[in-house]
UniProtKB/Swiss-Prot annotation:
One of its GO terms (biological process) is translation. The keyword Ribosomal protein applies. It comes from the Bacteria. Keywords: Ribonucleoprotein, Ribosomal protein. The gene is rpsP. Signal peptide: none annotated. Pfam families: Ribosomal_S16. One of its GO terms (molecular function) is structural constituent of ribosome. This is Small ribosomal subunit protein bS16. PANTHER family: 30S RIBOSOMAL PROTEIN S16, SMALL RIBOSOMAL SUBUNIT PROTEIN BS16M. It comes from Finegoldia magna (strain ATCC 29328 / DSM 20472 / WAL 2508) (Peptostreptococcus magnus). GO terms for cellular component: cytoplasm; small ribosomal subunit. Belongs to the bacterial ribosomal protein bS16 family.
Length: 83
């Protein structure tokens, strides 16, 4: 089972916000997930990212891979250092 840290789209049409979740890579984008570890709201003037960094570090240590978008969000918000 390959585990990814990715975005799950929520909200209404043309007004999205995203939950940052840990999910099996074979599950659909908005389908079943293992754990919710934060959220991202791109629509407010100052984009909001709230993440439980301890859970992120734990999942990465256990082998979860963040998607490119989530990786960029984490680096821009200081969840972990750029390599």
């Amino acid at each position: 089972m390959s585990v990814k840290i990715r975005l799950k789209r929520m909200g209404a049409k043309k007004k999205p916000f995203y939950r940052i979740v840990v999910a099996d890579s074979r599950c659909p984008r908005d389908g079943k997930f293992i754990e919710e570890i934060g959220y991202y709201n791109p629509l407010v003037e100052e984009k909001t990212v709230k993440v439980d960094s301890e859970k992120v570090q734990q999942w990465i240590k256990n082998g979860a891979k963040p998607t490119d978008t989530v990786d960029r969000l984490f680096k821009n918000n200081g969840v972990y250092e750029a390599k």
